[in-house]
């Protein structure tokens, strides 16, 4: 097998699509803080001088949405007019409806409880908020069990943001993107980094030479382990030649447009559903988190080198319609036995996921930039590996 290249990208918190994601999740968190049972589907558009928040929300909480929007924008770093977008004076428009009663009926009273009125299992009460398929993935390429390309891309973006916020590089602006191409050997092990692309918004005065030096010396070489860099590694720094106009002034942003950045950088499959702005009754989000939790525990238990999990749901139904485990031939036991173990160890009904991962908390804004998985900078319940022994015990007793 020939060596191959694989590329993943990340974007900064100041990227317009990520600004929208963070606003949607900040609103979700504000709702959950006051009413943990809020049903939220919140979308955001950002463009030059304007934010538009819309969607369907059912809650007992009162939240000053305009205030949440402005505080989020200012936290990201758009805090003065010369950046082309300013949380202090941008227009904020809000158009929120209540959740459809047809959807709410299926969520609050699952098909299982409607067909069997004597069903007293509280975890059967909540039906999935929609149909759909969700994937989770884990692989032993990094300590956090993530693919190396997306892991490095996220770390590059966090480093650029850190240098901006601590004023080490005062000429940096909030918008940025990174892309990392990794070369794999014939056994699919990471061999080296072939190409690094960083495009970062700057002020107009800094020279391209200074930008390049800073990105290579203070970002790339600080983030990417030296063993992956060699004399053939290519560094493409602001290759367009100029990146001064950025953020929502340069491009409009919309919630849910960076779903590959949010997950595994294209290394694993994706069901198509976005995460931000959605409460945990939306299986697009909660089941994707659960699938990652399952996959990570399988790999952490030493049961496979890599693992992809697919879950699928029907609207208004509590139990998943399918569970699939695929270890791509790296499993220590048969994938069918792993699937049995997963059904035994993990409760993958929506209410079971919510309880297992404690998802009614205001924890989501921190996930809306730099990825939802493999995070080492925040504490996320779906990143824990506390089910490994349960999996091993089931496998041992059922071989």
Curated annotation (Swiss-Prot):
Record's subunit section: Homotetramer; dimer of dimers.
Binding site for L-methionine: 56, 99, 251, 282
Principal location class: cytoplasm
A GO MF label: ATP binding
CC terms in the record's Gene Ontology section: cytoplasm
Swiss-Prot/TrEMBL cofactor(s): Mg(2+); K(+)
Residues annotated for K(+) binding in this entry: 43
Chain sites annotated for binding Mg(2+): 17
Coiled coil: none
Annotated function: Catalyzes the formation of S-adenosylmethionine (AdoMet) from methionine and ATP. The overall synthetic reaction is composed of two sequential steps, AdoMet formation and the subsequent tripolyphosphate hydrolysis which occurs prior to release of AdoMet from the enzyme.
Source organism: Lactobacillus helveticus (strain DPC 4571)
Name of protein: S-adenosylmethionine synthase
Record's subcellular location: Cytoplasm
NCBIfam families referenced in this protein's UniProt entry, alphabetically: metK
Region of interest (Flexible loop), ranges: 99-109
Biological processes per GO annotation: one-carbon metabolic process; S-adenosylmethionine biosynthetic process
Family from the record: Belongs to the AdoMet synthase family.
Positions annotated to bind ATP: 15, 175-177, 242-243, 251, 257-258, 274, 278
């Amino acid at each position: 097998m020939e060596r191959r290249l694989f590329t993943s990208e990340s974007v900064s918190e100041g990227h317009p699509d990520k600004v929208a994601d963070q606003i949607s999740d900040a609103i979700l968190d504000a709702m959950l803080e006051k009413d943990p049972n809020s049903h939220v589907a919140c979308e955001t558009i950002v463009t030059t001088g304007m934010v538009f928040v819309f969607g369907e929300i059912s809650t007992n909480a009162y939240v000053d949405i305009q205030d949440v929007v402005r505080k989020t924008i200012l936290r990201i770093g758009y805090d003065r007019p010369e950046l082309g977008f300013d949380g202090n004076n941008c227009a904020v428009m809000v158009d929120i409806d209540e959740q459809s009663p047809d959807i709410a009926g299926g969520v609050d009273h699952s098909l299982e409880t409607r067909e069997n009125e004597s069903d007293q299992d509280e975890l059967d009460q909540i039906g999935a908020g929609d149909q759909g398929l969700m994937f989770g993935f884990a692989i032993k390429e990094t300590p956090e069990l993530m693919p190396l390309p997306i892991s490095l891309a996220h770390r590059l973006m966090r480093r650029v943001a850190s240098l901006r916020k601590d004023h080490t590089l005062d000429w940096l602006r909030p918008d940025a993107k990174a892309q990392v191409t990794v070369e794999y050997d014939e056994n699919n092990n990471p061999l080296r980094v072939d190409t690094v692309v960083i495009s970062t918004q700057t002020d107009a005065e800094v020279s391209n030479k200074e930008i390049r030096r800073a990105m290579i010396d203070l970002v790339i070489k600080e983030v990417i382990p030296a063993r992956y860099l060699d004399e053939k590694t290519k560094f493409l720094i602001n290759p367009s030649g100029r990146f001064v106009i950025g953020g929502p002034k340069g491009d409009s942003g919309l919630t849910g447009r960076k779903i590959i950045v949010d997950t595994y950088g294209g290394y694993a499959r994706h069901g198509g559903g976005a995460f931000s702005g959605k409460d945990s009754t939306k299986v697009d989000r909660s089941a994707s988190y659960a699938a990652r939790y399952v996959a990570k525990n399988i790999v952490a238990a030493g049961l496979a080198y890599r693992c992809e999990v697919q879950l699928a749901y029907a609207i208004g139904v509590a139990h998943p319609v399918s569970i699939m485990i695929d270890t791509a031939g790296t499993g220590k036991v048969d994938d069918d036995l792993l699937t049995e173990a997963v059904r035994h160890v993990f409760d993958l009904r929506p209410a079971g996921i919510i309880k297992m991962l404690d998802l009614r908390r205001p924890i989501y804004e921190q996930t809306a930039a730099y990825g939802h998985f493999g995070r080492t900078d925040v504490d996320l319940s779906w990143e824990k590996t506390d089910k490994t022994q349960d999996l091993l015990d089931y496998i041992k007793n059922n071989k």
